[in-house]
Amino acid sequence: MNNEYADKLKAYGIDPAKYDEYEMEEIADTLNTYEENKAQADSYRKELEAGEESDNGYHEFLQGMADREIISLYENYGIVTNIKIEGWEPTKNEH
């Protein structure tokens, strides 16, 4: 088991023992993309708050992209992470 992937999954409340190496890599990649998009959204939001950017909705777009990564984990693997997404809750009966 790749410890880097296992640690990444554990950080998000996901049990790595449920997944093979390939699945863990895919899940970890998705979480990395989430982190990148979330960081960009947060950075842009700070620029808005500081008056350095005008509000064109770009930060909401970036946050939506980040949220979509987490939702895709649920859709593709049935994974519910410890991340809360405003306006979305996983439906237990889908999986």
Predicted regions mapped to residue ranges:
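Acidic, low-complexity, intrinsically disordered interaction modules
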Residues: 15-92
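Short terminal alpha-helical segments
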Residues: 3-20
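Generic non-transmembrane alpha-helix signal with a bias for helix starts/N-cap capping motifs
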Residues: 1-2, 67
